[in-house]
Structure formats: structure tokens, C-alpha cells
Amino acid sequence: MSTKLILSFSLCLMVLSCSAQLLPWQKGQRSRPHHGHQQFQHQCDIQRLTASEPSRRVRSEAGVTEIWDHDTPEFRCAGFVAVRVVIQPGGLLLPSYSNAPYITFVEQGRGVQGVVVPGCPETFQSGSEFEYPRSQRDQRSRQSESGESSRGDQRSRQSESEESSRGDQRSRQSESEEFSRGDQHQKIFRIRDGDVIPSPAGVVQWTHNNGDNDLISITLYDANSFQNQLDENVRNFFLAGQSKQSREDRRSQRQTREEGSDRQSRESQDDEALLEANILSGFEDEILQEIFRNVDQETISKLRGENDQRGFIVQARDLKLRVPEEYEEELQRERGDRKRGGSGRSNGLEQAFCNLKFRQNVNRPSRADVFNPRAGRINTVDSNNLPILEFIQLSAQHVVLYKNAILGPRWNLNAHSALYVTRGEGRVQVVGDEGRSVFDDNVQRGQILVVPQGFAVVLKAGREGLEWVELKNDDNAITSPIAGKTSVLRAIPVEVLANSYDISTKEAFRLKNGRQEVEVFRPFQSRDEKERERFSIV
């Protein structure tokens, strides 16, 4: 009886432990700390918005990292940090993790993305086998023989030495078997332009450009997220590499910051936190040698990034990755689900997180959520079609407007948004809570415009059209249009509109039903333009 009680108690503890590990990934309303979004609300008294481009560029061996000035009122209000990364062909963005969740949009190019989630199994295996290094095997064999010859004069420790030798032999045999099986690792997948790639805080990701053109991506960090347990600054922790600046240069910059203005000091400090150093560089050689057995001093030095001036985007050499096609990924995921369902066993974390997709493309017209053949389309990625977004409370929307087409006016009910223009140019107007314009200007490719929650925005494309991606800090961000078939005015009775605007019921009816389109509107056309269009179609 006592044995059964002990077993039951142990099982309960194990279940509680697994649940505790999953809590950090659950939605933020239940675990948002006191220093989250509420702390920075006083910074949202915005009088003017700006469409901005990157203010700082950090060069590496095989690419460039561009950082927006996130010390502006709108960036601090939203808690956003924006970074654009350009990886040259053959370049590798080194593995790193962040203290804040983020969402990445691939603007241009193709490549390979790797994701490492703590606690998840290594389900990928390379197709090629490795040959166990002959030199190491021969050297260890000679060391073993030398040890055996010397044990004749040390009979008192013979049994301990034999046991150690057997342990070394088993270790060498196990290592040799691992080499013969090939390399095992966590998931990797192909990425291309239009892909949205999310990442929770603390999850390691890396990117390789295996294409022929530059791989360009824009990343938005949510510094105010419940997953960020530090302050409002975003920090990247790299597992390899080193900044191109020497430690002496960084010390000199710190001293300059102390003597400079507060604003410049904050900007430099924030940028340095994003791209400063390899986290392994702070550990002593002796500790690393004890942890990573069977590696020489040169490898330890390279782990710490000593004398490494390549930066955090390096030129990869002989990097050949066996990447599954998309249909193979889906098949593998389905097989895993059936296997777990049939066995009835699961470790909880695997079902909840390890098998979630880390990619969704928003540049496919066939999957548009809103489509107007004469105006444009909207593709949305949220937790409904990419469930991992529920864990990080971020989402994305890709909008394509044709020539002179209009989107809006509309506002975000539950999120701030950052509009990043990917093609074309157009005019944007934003109106704040005081009923006056806080932005009225043209935007073009490469600019970001932050629109706070509740601010109404309208966009009109230019002659070449306008495309942009909106990155939002809610996994199910909701917009409310003011005009159109699904608008707020359409849902209000005619009599209420007539009294609200002091107009006749006839005018209120026209106001309410003037547009039958949904969010994306074709441009106004005169009678002559309509006739010319009809004639050209015929």
C-alpha cells in the first residue's frame, strides 16, 4: 500500500513539474508581470508620428544589420524594436536568442531557418554519415596502450584503472556509433519572401542564405511582452561569433556615452545590447574545457570568440543542409500526431510546442482573407492559422494595394502596429485621440510607421501601387473599419447616424451604404474613366 502511495505521489509531482515548465509559454493575461505594458502607458501622449528609416548600420563579414531608433515616442509607446538584416549569398546569421519575443518577415530572397526549442527532441538527421576521425582514434588507442603498460607497476590501483579504461572504451565506442549514425538536430526549414517567422523569448534561431541573392528580413521585437522579465530594452544573446569591434573599442564607446547626452547614451546602450558579444566569451577556459570534453584549447578559444572579427553574420563554408520540402514537413507532423494518438503517451511539451509550425507565408493571393479584383488584397497571419503566435501574442498582416486604391480608414482595437513598406509609395493619414492629424505624408519602401492602438489610419496607393506588412503586438489583432460593408457605420441605425451628424435620413442612408466593398476600396472614377475602362475590357 505504501509503495502505491509513493508511486502516486511521484507521478503527481512529475505532472506538476511538466505543467510548470509550460506556464511561461501560455498566454500573457495569466502571467503578465507588473512591469509589462502598464508601466509605459504614460509615454503614449503622442503629438506627431514619423515614417522612419534605420538610423544605425552594423556591418559583418557577410551582411549588414540595420537598427531603427527606438527611442522615439511612438516606438517607446508601442514597446517595439525594429531591426532589418541583410544576409549575403552564403552568409550565416549566427545562432542567438532574445529576452523578448519577436516576429520576422522575409522581404526578399530564399534561405534555411533553424529553430532550437529547449526540451524538444532532435527529430532531424542529416543524410550523410561522418567518419570517425582516424587521428583521434589512433592517438587515444596509443594512450590506452601506454596506460596498460604502466599499470603493471601499480598493482594497488589496477582495478580502478581497468574500470576507467573500460569506461573510456565504452565512451569511444558510443562516440563512434554516433558518428556512424550521422548528425542529429532540431527542425530546419526553407524560407522565402513573404514568410512570417515567429520566435518566443529564449528560443534559439539561425538563418543561412543558400540562394543567389541577398536575403532581407525585417524583425519586430515586443519589449513590453510578458515574456520579457528584464527592462524595456531588447537584448540578443549570441552563442557564437563576436562583434567586429574590439573590446577596447567598446570600452571607449562606453566612456564616450558617459560623457555624451542622455539620448545618445540610451541609443548606443540599446544597440550594444542587440549586437554586442558572444555569451560564451564570459566563461573561463577551464570551465569550458571541463564541460566540453575531448576538445582542444584552440576550439575553446573559438567558442569564446577570441580574435574573431567577422561579426554576427559570417560567410559559411562547406555548409550543406538536407532540408525537407514543405509537403514532407506536413507528412512528418501528421505521422507524429498519429503516433502520439495511438500510443496514448506524450510528454506534454512535445504536443504543446515542439510540433508547432514556425512559418506561414502571407504573399499568396490564393489565401487572401480580403480580395478586391480592382483594389487589392489582405493576407493575415494570426493564432488561428499559425498557433505558435498565441504563445508570443504577435501577428502580421500583408496588404497589397493596386494603383490609386485605398485602405481604411480603420483602427486597431487591441494592438499597436508597425507598418513596414515593402514596395511602391503612397499617402498615409493618421488621426489621434484629440481628433487632429498626427501624420499626413507620403511613405516609400524601407520606411516604418508605428500606429498606436485606437489611432485611425487611411492609406492611398500611388501610381505604382503600395505594399506593406503590418506587425502587431496581439496574436489575434482586430481592426475596425469606418467605411465599407463590414464597417462600424454599417452597423449603426440610420436614425442614429442622422442625429449624430445632423443630416437627413436620406443622406445617412447614402453614407451608410455608399461602399459595398470590404476594407480595400477601388479608386473613385469619373464617368469618362468608367467608359474608357469598359471599352478597354470589351
UniProtKB/Swiss-Prot annotation:
Q: Which InterPro entries match?
A: 11S_seedstore_pln (IPR006044), Cupin_1 (IPR006045), RmlC-like_jellyroll (IPR014710), RmlC_Cupin_sf (IPR011051), Seed_Storage-Functional (IPR050253)
Signal sequence annotation = 1-20
Task: State the SMART domains in the record.
Answer: Cupin_1
Q: Is Signal included in the keywords of this UniProt record?
A: yes
Biased region (Basic and acidic residues) positions are 131-194, 245-268, 326-340
Cupin type-1 domain span: 49-301, 360-509
One annotated GO molecular function:
nutrient reservoir activity
Pfam families, per this entry?
Answer: Cupin_1 (PF00190)
Q: Which domain of life is it from?
A: Eukaryota
Going by the UniProt record, its keywords in alphabetical order are: Allergen, Disulfide bond, Seed storage protein, Signal, Storage protein
Q: List the disulfide bonds.
A: C44-C77, C120-C354
**Region labeled Disordered — which residues?**
125-194, 241-272, 326-346
Protein task: Seed storage protein.
On assembly, the entry states:
Hexamer; each subunit is composed of an acidic and a basic chain derived from a single precursor and linked by a disulfide bond.
Q: Which family does it belong to?
A: Belongs to the 11S seed storage protein (globulins) family.
| Name this polypeptide is given | 13S globulin seed storage protein 3
Give the originating organism.
Answer: Fagopyrum esculentum (Common buckwheat)
The uppermost taxa in this organism's lineage are: Eukaryota, Viridiplantae, Streptophyta, Embryophyta, Tracheophyta
